[in-house]
Design a protein with these regions (language model features):
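Conserved SGNH/GDSL esterase-like catalytic core that processes O-acyl groups on lipids
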Residues: 30, 41-140
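A generic structural signal for well-ordered alpha-helical segments
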Residues: 66-67, 149, 182-186
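Active-site-proximal beta-strand/loop segments in catalytic clefts of secreted hydrolases
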Residues: 34-36, 77-82, 107-110, 161-165, ...
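Substrate-gating cap/lid alpha-helix
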Residues: 159-198
């Protein structure tokens, strides 16, 4: 076997080499994606009155593109404007989205504080042993989501994606979210951070 596939350069970063086949992204057979407009392929358009309309266009979303490239089945549980609170408290149950997947990608956080004004809290709001005790904060609800997914598939690989930097005043909060999400990932087996603030 040629081990060159597995070797990383001394200073190589994840986005240094982008493969047309998505590299090892096809290692999973089925992935669930929990996210907001950045995962739902949301488009902005104008109606006949000139008002802005937002429409989720799942067939154009990055999970749909990865599905076509890799052959992996992507179940997209996202919606524009989604927050960790809404996903946990109503959206997933109302739509039957608590389903088995081999892996999950959770990409929330853009709307929670910056749009809806939900308190961020901290990883101290997460009780992994008794998630119903989690505080009603972004981190408390993220902890509940991960706990629920782990009850569905204890060995699921969960990838938590941080919000991306915007070059705005909110970047300080985004860096805080990333640092706390790293701690959240450390609380659970097979749970990994995809830190968009680092690339």
């Amino acid at each position: 076997m040629d081990n060159k596939w597995f070797e990383l350069g001394a200073n190589e970063q994840p986005l240094d080499i982008i493969k047309e086949t998505c590299g090892f992204a096809g290692i999973f057979k089925q992935i669930g994606v929990i996210g907001d407009s950045l995962a739902s392929g949301e488009f902005e358009s104008h109606d006949e009155n000139g008002s802005i309309v937002y429409t989720d266009m799942y067939e154009y979303s990055w999970p749909a593109v990865l599905e076509r490239i890799t052959g992996t089945k992507y179940n997209n549980y996202s919606r524009g404007g989604m927050t960790a609170r809404e996903y946990m408290q109503s959206w997933a149950d109302a739509n039957g989205f608590w389903k088995w997947n081999q892996a999950y990608i959770i990409a929330l956080g853009n709307n929670d504080s910056f749009v809806c004004g939900h308190p961020l809290g901290s990883v101290k709001d997460v009780n992994a042993e008794c998630p119903r005790d989690n505080a009603d904060t972004f981190f408390g609800n993220m902890g509940k989501i991960v706990c629920k997914l782990k009850t569905i598939e204890p060995n699921a690989r969960i990838f938590v994606v941080t919000p991306q930097l915007r070059g705005e005043a909110c970047d300080k909060d985004i860096r805080y979210i990333a640092s706390e999400l790293a701690k959240l990932c450390d609380m659970f087996d097979f749970t990994y951070l995809l830190d968009m603030t680092a690339h």
